[in-house]
Amino acid sequence: MASSDILSVARTDDGSVCEVSLRGGRKKTTVYLPDTEPWVVETDAIKDAFLSDGIVDMARKLHRGALPSNSHNGLRMVLFCYCYLQNCVYLALFLCPLNPYLVTPSSIEFAEPVVAPEVLFPHPAEMSRGCDDAIFCKLPYTVPIINTTFGRIYPNSTREPDGRPTDYSMALRRAFAVMVNTSCAGVTLCRGETQTASRNHTEWENLLAMFSVIIYALDHNCHPEALSIASGIFDERDYGLFISQPRSVPSPTPCDVSWEDIYNGTYLARPGNCDPWPNLSTPPLILNFK
């Protein structure tokens, strides 16, 4: 087979390509006519699909007749639309069900994995405010008034009758220490003037658990993420947290322990009101110590 050599290649104004070759000592001229249909390089078409006006521009060309309405361009249009819809779905997934800051999943299909509670994600600027901001002052229980042998100590860290600042956190810790002493029978819990629980009452253990959460909240400035772990709202192990003893409660103390050091002690640092002042429409809880 004789080989051929291309002598020249030229392109005319109408888009035809003229090729002159030498084969077996004879010249041969070949003319390549342009395609009857416009053709877009596929890679360029894919790039256009991700532009803001890619689909719109192609639809306009199809409508004006600049692009033929054949199967090839129809398939390209379908693929472009699919790419846009796919990206919209991905964006919706990241913004809604896969967003860790979203507390409630948008639908049951996206209920798993479990979304962390909202209290785990407070705004960083709010974290340092502690109990001074209302977002941290929501305890799951009503904080009781402690009626000591010297007088009442209120949840807003004041005492009766003069309203002098008093360390309510220390008072509640001492009250808890007396309550866990099984030999102390003179402790009762009243709702106003009505007694609601005593040591032999079935709700006594629930009261101890409730007060331990309040003590933990006061010790941690009512930060909600600490309170959630202490109150058992969620299992910290589900979120990679391993806490050996989330709640540290005082040990039992003698029944006749004196309240004088707390009631008459100097209290300068006020931790803030971790629980709103009891609603006047409902009688407050009162812990009585004889």
Swiss-Prot record:
Domain of life according to the entry: Viruses
Protein's recorded name: Protein ORF27
The species this protein was found in: Human herpesvirus 8 type P (isolate GK18)
Top-level taxonomy: Viruses, Duplodnaviria, Heunggongvirae, Peploviricota, Herviviricetes
